[in-house]
Amino acid sequence: MDCAFIRCNLFLLKFKDIQPDRASRYMEETKEQILVQHLLQKKEAAWKELFGAYSGNLAYVCSRYVAEKEDAHDILQNSFIKMFRSIESFEYRGAGSLKAWMTRITVNEALKHIKQKGSFSSHIEINDLPDIPNEEEADFEEIPRENIMEMIRKLPEGYRTVFNLFVFEKKSHKEIAVLLGIAENSSASQFHRAKGLLIQKIKDFKTSKKAQYE
């Protein structure tokens, strides 16, 4: 499962688990509940607030799945349309549940976009790179987050899609296989190849940076 890699990746991408105190969580939940009520009433101001608060984060999600800005924009737009049309199905389950619901819709729209373009392939090119030993891990030390994300964006589409679902969406290879209509071992292979390509990109990046100071 390469759990060490996932832990390293999430930590060095500077994602932090911050536990708010009880009062802060209550205030956040209350604010979200009021917003949801207004969204259900289709109040324009509420939808503008929702877009302002979450569009940046969701645009970032879109850009992890597709390389072209125009495609990311289309996915984001379709995601908000889907949210507007399906808000009645949303069930509030506490702080963070609204964001989770929106992210889930955005990821689904990204996958839909990729499938419609017909650009996703489950084929594995064995000569893409040398085999990477299972124990070798990606060393993200001292690499800016945006550089890491750019490396992910430049992965072949199949590798990138599987990598995103496994690492960021925390899907199992069995779940990914169902989502993408591929074999479970194909998902695992594509993740392994994605990891290998990232390791090579990171090595090249560090070598390039080191050469600048010599």
Where do the language-model regions lie?
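Internal acidic/polar
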Residues: K112, F120-R145
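Short, charged helix-capping/linker segments at alpha-helix termini
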Residues: L40-E49, A59-N78, E184, K206-K209, ...
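Arg/Lys-rich amphipathic alpha helix in sigma70-family domain 2
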Residues: S89, T103-I124
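Short helix-capping/turn signature of helix-turn-helix
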Residues: A53-G56, R64-Y65, N164-K171
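Sigma70-family region 2
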Residues: L40-Q41, F80-A95, Q116-K117
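DNA-recognition helix of helix-turn-helix
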Residues: L111, Y159, F168, L179-T207
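N-terminal module of bacterial RNA polymerase sigma factors
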Residues: M1-G56, R153, K174-E175, T207, ...
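Structural recognition of an alpha-helix C-terminal capping motif at a helix-to-coil junction
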Residues: Y60, D74-I81, G96-N108
